[in-house]
Each structure stands twice: as C-alpha cells, then as structure tokens.
From Swiss-Prot:
Gene3D superfamilies: 3.70.10.10. Belongs to the herpesviridae DNA polymerase processivity factor family. Plays an essential role in viral DNA replication by acting as the polymerase accessory subunit. Associates with the viral polymerase to increase its processivity and forms high-affinity direct interactions with DNA. Facilitates the origin-binding protein loading onto DNA thus increasing its ability to assemble into a functional complex capable of unwinding duplex DNA. GO terms for molecular function: DNA binding. A motif (Bipartite nuclear localization signal) lies at residues 358-373. GO terms for biological process: DNA replication; positive regulation of DNA-directed DNA polymerase activity. Keywords: DNA replication, DNA-binding, Host nucleus. This is DNA polymerase processivity factor. Residues 354-376 are annotated as: Disordered. Interacts with the DNA polymerase catalytic subunit. Interacts with the origin-binding protein.
Length: 405
C-alpha cells in the first residue's frame, strides 16, 4: 500500500503518515495530546479499588477525555464503570479532542491495567499514561516505574552495590480503538439514597438464595424494605436534607406510636433526592450480591439510585464512595402481581428498623419449598390502613389491581 506522501530523508516511521489525518509532529511537546499520572496517594487509591477485580480487567476499555479516565469492564456478567476524575490523579493534562478509547489487552498476556494487580503493589511507584498523535489514530504509551533489588550481574555492569534498590521502567504501547459505543443513563435518578457499609451489608445478608428474587420497596412511612425469599430488612429513610421531595412526610404519625423496644433505632438511610413510592424487582439473572462482594468495600458506603421512568426499563444503580466511585446498573421490572402498599408493618413492631427479621428454627420452612405468596385479602390491606368496611358495617371487596396514589 502506497503512503500518502513520500518519506523524508532520514526515514520517519511509516506509522507517522496516516490517511485522512495530519502527520505526527516531530516536536514531542506538540505531539503529546494527554497525560495521566498515578503516584503516591492516587496510586494507592487505584490499587485499593482495582486490585479486587483485577482478573476482570484484562479486556477492559480505557476512555480518556477532559474529565479524566473511565474504565469500563464486565465483572460476573455485570457491566461496571469506574470513573477516575482528574482530582483523583497525581496530575492530568488533556488537549481538546474527541474521547480516546483503548482496549486494555495488549498481546493476550499483558494489559494496560496489570500494573494495578496485587502482586505488583509493593514494587510499583508510578504509572504514567501518555497519548500522542491525532484522532482517530492516537497511540497510548504506558510507562510503569518500579523498584527492584540490585543483583550481582548489575554490579558487574557498573551499577550500585549489590542489594541496593534500583528504579526500573517498562512500557506498553497500544493503538486507539475506533469501533466502540458506551451506553450510560443520561437522566437523573428519580430517587437517591446514601447507605453506610453496615447498612449495605444488611441488604446483602437478606440475599441468601441465588434464585430468590430481590425486591426493593419504598413505602408511605418513609421506609425502604428489601425482601428476598422469606427474609427482609427494613430501614427508615431520613429525607430532611433531600431535594425535590414532593410527598408529605408521615414521620409525625410514627413519632406518636409507642415503640416497645429497649434498643435504640439504628441510623436511618439518608435520602439524597426524590421521594416516591415504588416497588422494583431485580431481574432473575442479576448478580447483585456477588458483584458487590467481589468489590470488597472497606469502610466506604454506597449510593442507591432508582430509575423509575420510563416504566418499560426501570433500573437500580449503585455507586460506591471513596476513594473513587465504582458505578453499576441492574435491570429491574415492576411486579405483575398486586403487592403491599402503604405503611410497613415493621415500623410498628418491636424489631428495630435496619435489623433483619429473625425467625425461630421451628418456623423456618424447608429450603426447597418456595416462600408463601401474599394475596390481596382483607388481612393484607387492613395491615396497611385500607378501609374495608362501610358505615353500615358491610365489607367492601378488595381491589384486584394494585392501588396507585
């Protein structure tokens, strides 16, 4: 294939001449388009977040733009997005250009994210990503600086004394990936809640059986109920500092109810924005619990985002907190059967909110038996303050469809 122009004397590399783009500039300063540096604290944060999922990063995508770096990968069959903002790096520079996408896998054995594996953590001191050339033919050069002990062979070649520490570097080169599309929700979540690590663990504790559906339900009495099989956990939600809360609070009614418990109520979930009633069921093939456990969160909590509209594709998003966010999205559906509405019965029981419902061994059903389904009978609706008797004492038939408010 002929080059678009003749090579100059001295022999520039053929890759320096590209169809439909400008040739690479000889000046290295002008040729550089972006640079990201991980060192000291930013490097430790990257290790902390990426090491647990390192086996899933071989075929990850790295997307650079003016906001920083986004890592897109698949963990346990679920899509995971890790945005690393510019303030989470030691330094970052970007010249205006379309986002640059690179596949982490270099040659089947090595990858651009191998530097963040646990086995290299003690040796790596600095990781630099440098992007050169013009879109759509940019080149990424990764340089990893690490320390190693001097050997007898190094001493014979004139290096420092044997046993001293020497800084070495290794490089990987990767060309831009041009056939890539990234899909992320562009709308704001309808409801957002902030959870601590302990509260998130209580939710994971409910998800015992892999085949049991997981249901998230937000009720009138400002509670979030999570159910799976015959287990459930109920949290109170504090909307005091939430934005755009359009539902009148019923906390005053709850304060008047006697709470027969000697234990203090656990810390409530903090509502960030939105305040709506909903019931969402995670899709059956969702690896919700397995994915969160694989991330090995330490003391950081998470933010639950509920995307309720449009009705055809509701989702639940979960974003971890410090050192930087890891985002994941789970497809959901609205229940087809009428479900419980109104107040949570657990709000008036002696069991504190945020605590799982404990059952005696004699009350436990056999593990191979499906949990009992709730039907819209009188008992169900009476427990939720729905009037079922008229003034003459005649019983009013229960509605067959869910009640919408």
């Amino acid at each position: 294939m002929a080059l678009p122009r003749a090579m100059r004397p001295g022999g520039s590399h053929p890759n320096n001449f590209l169809f439909n783009t400008l040739p690479v500039i000889d000046n290295p300063v002008e040729r550089q388009r972006a640079m990201a540096v991980f060192e000291r604290e930013s490097l430790r944060d990257a290790f902390e977040m990426l090491t647990p999922i390192a086996p899933s990063l071989k075929n990850a995508f790295l997307i650079f733009n003016e906001d920083g770096l986004l890592i897109h990968t698949s963990v346990g069959g679920e899509q995971v997005y890790i945005p690393i903002q510019t303030n989470n790096m030691e330094s970052y520079s970007w010249k205006k250009a379309p986002p640059a996408v690179f596949l982490a896998n270099v040659d089947g054995r090595r990858g651009l994210l191998d530097a963040f594996k646990a086995k290299t953590q003690t040796n790596v001191s600095k990781v630099v990503f440098e992007i050169e050339n013009y879109s759509p033919s940019r080149i990424l050069t990764q340089t990893v600086f690490s320390a190693r002990d001097q050997t007898e062979e190094d001493t014979e070649m004139g290096s420092d004394a044997e046993g001293a520490t020497q800084t070495v570097s290794s490089r990987l080169v990767k060309h831009e990936f041009n056939n890539y599309a990234l899909m992320l929700p562009t709308r704001q979540p309808d409801v957002s809640m902030s959870l601590s690590k302990a509260q998130l663990n209580k939710i994971l504790g409910v998800c015992k059986q892999a085949g049991d559906p997981i249901t998230f339900q937000c009720l009138f009495d400002d509670t979030l109920q999570v159910r799976s099989g015959d287990r459930q956990v109920v949290f109170s939600v504090d909307y005091q500092h939430a934005d755009n809360c359009g539902v009148e609070s019923s906390s005053s009614l709850l304060e008047k109810m006697p709470m027969k418990t000697k234990k203090s109520a656990p810390e409530p979930i903090r509502g960030i924005s939105g305040r709506r009633l909903f019931t969402l069921v995670l899709d059956e093939d969702t690896n919700f619990k397995q994915l969160i456990q694989k991330l090995k969160l330490k003391n950081a909590g998470a933010v639950l985002n509920f995307f309720l509209d449009p009705d055809s594709i509701p989702m639940i998003g979960l974003s971890t907190k410090q050192p930087f966010s890891v985002m994941m999205f789970f497809m959901c559906s609205y229940p087809t059967q009428p479900c419980q509405v109104g107040f949570s019965p657990a709000a008036f029981s002696s069991t504190p909110m945020g605590a799982g419902v404990k059952r005696r061994a004699s009350e436990e059903e056999e593990s191979d038996q499906p949990p009992k389904k709730l039907f819209p009978d009188g008992k169900l609706f009476k427990s939720n303050f729905v009037l079922l008797m008229d003034k003459t004492g005649a019983k009013i038939p229960c509605p067959e469809q869910p009640m919408h408010f």
